[in-house]
Amino acid sequence: MLVCNSCPRGNRPLLTRGPTIPYELTKMLSLLLYPLNQALLLALIALLAMIFHWPRMAFWSLLLGVTWLYLCSTLFFADYLMGTLEDSYTPKAMSVTPDADAIVLLGGAIRGDTHMGSLGDLNQQADRLVHALALYKAGKAPRILVSGGGQPGARSEAEIMYDLLTLMGVPPHAIMQENASRDTYQNAVYTAVMLEKLGINKILLVTSAFHMRRAEALFKAQGLEVIPAPTDYQRLVGPKTMPGWLPAVSDLWQSTYALHEIIGYWVYRYQGKL
C-alpha cells in the first residue's frame, strides 16, 4: 500500500496562472453562493431597507429573494441545472469501459467520524465507492488510488475509504492512499505526483456525474490521460411522480450542488487551474 500524506511536488509545476484564494476563504465565500443563503441575505437587505424607509428597494429585494428560492426549489429548474453538468457524461456499460493503469476514486462519499466509529458513515455520494469497487472487480485496472484528506473527524477520507474497500475484498496492496488534499484541485495535483512516481498516466476517474466536468479538466491539466467513469447521477429521467413546479427541499439541495459545481468550474478557470 502506497500512502501520500504531504505529496511534495517534485519537478511537476503548479498549474496556477491566475490569482489564488485561501482555502478557508473559498469555503466561506461558497456558502454565500447557496440559494438559501442568498435568499436570506436578500431578506435581510429588504428588512434594512424597510427600517431606513426605502420601500422600493425593500420590495424588489424581497421579491427577488423569494423568487430565486422558489425557482431553486423546483424540480424543473434543479433538473435543468443538473442536466448542464451530467448530460455530457452518459453512463457506460462495464463491457465497453476501457481498461486503465489505475482507478482514481475521489473523496466526498464520507460524512466523517460518527457513532459508527472508525469506518465513518457514508453519505448520498456513496455510489462513488461502489462504482470504483465494481470497476476493480471487473478487471478494468489493477489498483485503486483513493484521494481525500481533511474532513470532520480524526481520520482522512482516504483512510476510511481504504478500510471500506479492504472490507469489501480489495487486497491492501492494490490500494493507494492520498491523504493530503482538501479540494478537487489538490486531488488532481497530489494524485498526479503519486502516479508520476509509479509511471502511471492512464486513469479511470470515478466521481459523481455532476462533479465530473470540473474534476476531469483538473486532472487533464496535470497531464494525465483521463477516462471519465461517472456515477451518482442526480437528474431524474422518465416519468416524474410530482409536478415540476412544486417546491421541495430535495430539489433545493440538488440546485445547490449544481450551482456549486458550475461556479466552482468557472472560478478554477479564472484562477488558471484548468
Language-model segments: what does each one mean?
Residues 4-7:
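Cysteine-centered motifs
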Residues 9-21:
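Short, Lys/Arg-enriched N-terminal segments with co-localized hydrophobic residues
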Residues 21-50:
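Membrane-embedded alpha-helical segments of integral membrane proteins
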Residues 238-242, 253-274:
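Extracytoplasmic/luminal low-complexity segments enriched in Pro/Gly and acidic/polar residues
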